[in-house]
């Protein structure tokens, strides 16, 4: 997979209360990914970008919420979430990948 596709697959970390608990207790990290990304692409992107070994990737398609505005109903975009499990002994540090 080329370097350009790696940056298009991983859109960024998803920070939430549940994601923080998963990272601390189970060593699982949550990313916002492209809607057309496959599990294999996500695995290769995380391994290549952060130099870690990935054990498992689970994906969830999150439906956008319907919101009311002054002009009627609107809808937020659908997006895809990936929960990445690392092999035992591996840890992910977001600050070191920016080098």
From Swiss-Prot:
Superkingdom of the organism of origin: Bacteria
GO biological process: translation
Gene Ontology molecular function, alphabetical: rRNA binding; structural constituent of ribosome
InterPro entries: Nucleotide-bd_a/b_plait_sf, Ribosomal_uL23-like, Ribosomal_uL23/eL15/eS24_sf
GO cellular component: ribonucleoprotein complex; ribosome
Paired cysteines (S-S): none
Keyword Nucleotide-binding among UniProt keywords: no
Protein family according to the UniProt entry: Belongs to the universal ribosomal protein uL23 family.
Complex and partners: Part of the 50S ribosomal subunit. Contacts protein L29, and trigger factor when it is bound to the ribosome.
UniProt xrefs under PANTHER family: 60S RIBOSOMAL PROTEIN L23A
Name of protein: Large ribosomal subunit protein uL23
Organism lineage string: Bacteria, Pseudomonadati, Pseudomonadota, Gammaproteobacteria, Pseudomonadales
């Amino acid at each position: 997979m080329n370097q350009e596709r790696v940056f298009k697959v991983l859109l960024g970390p998803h920070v939430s209360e549940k994601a923080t608990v998963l990272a601390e207790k189970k060593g699982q990290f949550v990313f916002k990914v492209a809607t057309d990304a496959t599990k294999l692409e996500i695995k290769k992107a995380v391994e290549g970008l952060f130099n870690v070994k990935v054990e498992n990737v689970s994906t969830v398609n999150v439906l956008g919420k319907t919101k009311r505005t002054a002009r009627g109903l609107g809808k937020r975009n659908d997006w895809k979430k990936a929960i990445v499990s690392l092999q035992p002994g591996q840890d992910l540090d977001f600050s070191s990948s920016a080098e």
